[in-house]
Every structure is written in C-alpha cells, then in structure tokens.
C-alpha cells in the first residue's frame, strides 16, 4: 500500500486485524509502533524461540533486541537500521547561493534569511504530516541533546519542561522557512524541490539517498550531498523496519519461513 511511513498501510492493517483477517506478516517500525498496539492487544506471536533457533540474539545489536522486546517476548524481526537525522542538499546550488550546510539551527535560521533575500521563497522543503513530525524529532534532538531526548520518552522530562517547550519554539521558527503547501506533498516530492533548485534543504531519513540514486539517477556525493541535521553531529537517531507474526495467520509456516529469510545474512544483504 502506498503512503510514506506506512500511514495508509496502518489503516488497512487495523481493518484486517480487527476484522479477524490478519495478514500472514506485515512491515512495522521496530518498537512501540508494534508493541504499543498489537502486542499489548495480544494479537502477535512471541518470536523468542525463532531468535534462539537462528542465533539472532548474538547477531543483532543488543539495543535493537531491547527495542523489539516486551514482557519477556521478542515481537518482530528487524531488516534494517535507518538514520533519520539527515539534512540533504545539492552542493552546486549551495555554492551558487554562497551558503554552507548549517551546523546548528541558529545557523540554519540565519541561512534561511540569506536565501530568502536571494529570492528563495521556502529554503526548507517539507512534505505531508509525518514528514513534519520527522523534522520535529531532529529539531528536538538538537535542542535537548541525546540524554534529555531519551528522558522525554521515559517520563523523566515533561513536555511542559522549559527545555521541551524551547524545542517547540525553535521548531516553529524552522517551519517559517518551509513551503506552505507541505500538507499536499509526499516526502519524495519534498526531495524533488531540493533537486529542482526550488529549496535548499530537506531533512529526511537516509532512504532519501535511495530515492535520489535509484529513481532520480543522481550521483551521491557529487550531484547531492548530506550532513547531520543541524545540532545533531555525532548522534545517530535510528529507526528500523521489521516484520512480525500475527496470531491466526492463515499461512503461518510460510510466514515463519519468510521471517527466517529476512532475518538471515542472505536476506539482510539482499534487502539492504
């Protein structure tokens, strides 16, 4: 099902899961996107035995195992690790405009004003709702730092804390540099604006490189380039696509065979 970040797929999945017609497996972001929905609803099978059989407890990073674990069970098989906090740009266009990739959000805001003065109406390309949430994550990570970013989600830092409020304030100023028609654009169309020279920057995960390289036939490092999103140098904000096994899958054994494949070295190398 089309739709960035699985927005449409999740709606279709909900209909099938609640209607007693679960798919044999489905793609889901590792962590609470699955655990906080279908795992706590007792709709998924525990894959711990499969992980032991395949030796994956030793193969996957411990932090990733922790992310897909809940109440003694392991609930999905990761197939990749993405970096989300990446800023994309075209070196030739930045040279033409006389600016550099900003290293902080303050630098970004100053660069934004410079570019607006040069006639670039919206220096930051932005797409539909989930891409705006994606951007907020990178802004908040920069403002809070890794420790307080984690504290925001484990309950040690409240969203009403002045540090958290400042993240929203910075985010608001960053949005002033973005296109006003963001809600109508896919993430690919937002990337296109950078490629077409209609915007200078786009904050998107490393899958944007796949789009520009494979679909747009651009050469990485030459035609397009990247940097950590402002203020996040040395920090790798990760996310992982994974597959789980719903209870009641009609082709359960085939689904398990699929999970074995995507979790294998051969499967991981092919997928990535």
Feature locations, PLM:
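Extracytoplasmic/periplasmic substrate-binding proteins
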Residues: 33-37, 135, 169-257
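Conserved N-terminal structural module of periplasmic/extracytoplasmic solute-binding proteins
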Residues: 1-41, 49-58, 72, 101, ...
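Short, solvent-exposed loop/beta-turn-alpha elements that line the ligand-binding surface or hinge
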Residues: 46-60, 143-166, 214-220, 224-236
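Extracytoplasmic/periplasmic solute-binding protein
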Residues: 70-79, 85, 109-157, 199
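Short helix-initiation/N-cap motifs at beta->coil->alpha
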Residues: 2-12, 103-110, 181-196
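Periplasmic-binding protein-like
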Residues: 119, 261-272
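Glycine-centered hinge/linker elements that transmit conformational signals in sensory
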Residues: 112-115, 153-184
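Hinge/lid segment of periplasmic solute-binding proteins
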Residues: 31-85, 100, 109, 135, ...
């Amino acid at each position: 099902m089309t739709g960035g970040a699985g927005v449409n797929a999740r709606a279709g999945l909900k209909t099938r899961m609640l209607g007693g017609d679960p798919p044999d497996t489905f793609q889901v972001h590792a962590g609470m996107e699955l655990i906080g929905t279908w795992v706590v609803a007792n709709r998924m099978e525990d894959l711990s035995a499969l992980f032991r059989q395949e030796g994956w407890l030793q193969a996957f990073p411990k932090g990733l195992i922790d992310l897909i674990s809940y109440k003694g069970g392991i609930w999905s098989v990761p197939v990749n690790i993405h970096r989300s906090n990446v800023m994309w740009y075209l070196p030739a266009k930045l040279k033409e405009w006389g600016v550099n990739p900003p290293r902080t959000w303050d630098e970004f805001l100053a660069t934004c004003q410079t570019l607006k003065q040069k006639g670039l109406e919206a220096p930051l390309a932005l797409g539909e709702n989930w891409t705006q949430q994606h951007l907020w994550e990178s802004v908040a990570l920069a403002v809070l730092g890794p420790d307080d970013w984690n504290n925001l989600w484990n309950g040690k830092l409240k969203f009403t804390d002045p540090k958290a409020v400042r993240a929203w304030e910075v985010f608001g100023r960053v949005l002033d540099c973005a296109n006003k028609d963001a809600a109508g654009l896919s993430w690919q169309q937002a990337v296109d604006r950078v490629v077409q020279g209609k915007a200078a920057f786009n904050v998107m995960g490393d899958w944007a490189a796949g789009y520009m390289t494979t679909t747009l036939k651009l050469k990485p490092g030459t035609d397009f380039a990247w940097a950590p999103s402002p203020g996040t140098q040395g920090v790798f904000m990760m996310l992982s696509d994974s597959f789980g096994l719903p209870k009641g899958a009609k082709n359960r054994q085939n689904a398990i065979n699929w999970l074995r494949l995507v979790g294998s070295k051969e499967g991981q190398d092919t997928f990535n």
